[in-house]
């Protein structure tokens, strides 16, 4: 943060000021100007089969390339969840025809700029600030997506116009959206520049048939070309008109699920210049403020002399908050937020804190080591290509002592099934997790060397452990 008075943002002077002294959380909404000027308040997932153009669409709308890692660029696939924020603007001159009156820009663009359309005056004004969660498309990475989906308000389902619909992962992702109870979906028929008009129409019929009876039934289908940025402003218009602004809770104690964490210090840094670890995640509820005392659970996990699990929550203080390159004084629920802390950076490096929960001291949920869940299994394995007209493999029932992968919030951990009834199961977790009764979890099983989604469950109750807190 640039110097000056504490509690007032001074970085990016062209954006709206945030002042902690005058902050009244009861008056905030997901469209409050001082919030959307600097951070996203709506999360939209991009889902669909591999190489159907999910990352390209995000880049066309936000200008940010979500493929950040070298091995991802070379293989042209997204492995970690990518995030990109975009501001959506609407021209205030009503004589401008739709969809030209909508425009999208990166998150550090000023909140208002003059029209550059010939013959039309007026200003483009900021109406939404959205965050795209670019989900990996491969089925092994399905778990990553269910983790990311813990914080999605809507989804863009991408279908490539030059392949038949549906492709295996398209159906697997639709199933994941149903599990997540996402109601708001836009279907984008991409790569429209590569096919004849008749092919596009034929595929449009295929898409309609495919989504019938699913959550995506009745969703708008927009033909686009992400590479040529064709029809992108139509997507912006639909995001504004069709995706309702989610109801958010600004007044509860804040809680953030950590999806990324890193050490920002360069090697060879002087001791006095060391910065604390940074945790990145999406705030589920409440407002985090610079200077606030925080707690991270489960914290440091170890075993005592008898081999029993112990958790020692980490206590720290927020020294900075940011959304992409924008400094914040306070952060609200919505897009990905970076939280600069005073935590020992080695605890944060290379995503070590993923799956932890950060929030106000003493207000976080319990830490569980065993869960009792009510669960539902899918009838068939999703996304497996089957030879000829054989149906996809059936999902076998849960068996006692088998090991599953359990996804809770942003944590993926192993779990051994210790008891199982018709629709109730007990699972002993490999890693303790901070969660609460009623949370949804996803279950995956190893099938032919890959983790495949087999069902989901809801936490009924469980065995919790008391965190160890140093008596200082």
Swiss-Prot record:
Stretches for region G2: 76-80
Annotated stretches, region: G4: 190-193
EC code: 3.6.5.3
Residue span(s) of domain tr-type G: 39-247
Recorded catalytic activity of this chain's protein: GTP + H2O = GDP + phosphate + H(+)
Region G5, residue ranges: 225-227
Location of region: G1: 48-55
Keywords in alphabetical order: Acetylation, GTP-binding, Hydrolase, Initiation factor, Nucleotide-binding, Phosphoprotein, Protein biosynthesis
Tissue: Widely expressed in males.
GO BP: formation of translation preinitiation complex; positive regulation of male gonad development; spermatogenesis
One GO MF term attached to the UniProt entry: tRNA binding
A Pfam family it matches: GTP_EFTU
Superkingdom of source: Eukaryota
UniProt-listed CDD domains: eIF2_gamma (cd01888), eIF2_gamma_II (cd03688), eIF2_gamma_III (cd15490)
GO cellular component term of the entry, any: eukaryotic translation initiation factor 2 complex
InterPro entries xrefs: EFTu-like_2 (IPR004161), eIF2G (IPR050543), eIF2g_C (IPR015256), eIF2g_dom_2 (IPR044127), eIF2g_GTP-bd (IPR044128), P-loop_NTPase (IPR027417), T_Tr_GTP-bd_dom (IPR000795), Transl_B-barrel_sf (IPR009000)
Residue numbers spanned by region G3: 134-137
Function: Member of the eIF2 complex that functions in the early steps of protein synthesis by forming a ternary complex with GTP and initiator tRNA. This complex binds to a 40S ribosomal subunit, followed by mRNA binding to form the 43S pre-initiation complex (43S PIC). Junction of the 60S ribosomal subunit to form the 80S initiation complex is preceded by hydrolysis of the GTP bound to eIF2 and release of an eIF2-GDP binary complex. In order for eIF2 to recycle and catalyze another round of initiation, the GDP bound to eIF2 must exchange with GTP by way of a reaction catalyzed by eIF-2B.
NCBIfam families hit by this protein: PRK04000.1 (NF003077)
Other noteworthy facts: Has a homolog on chromosome X (Eif2s3x).
Subunit structure: eIF2 is a heterotrimer composed of an alpha (EIF2S1), a beta (EIF2S2) and a gamma (Eif2s3x and Eif2s3y) chain. eIF2 is member of the 43S pre-initiation complex (43S PIC).
Protein name (database record): Eukaryotic translation initiation factor 2 subunit 3, Y-linked
Organism in which the protein naturally occurs: Rattus norvegicus
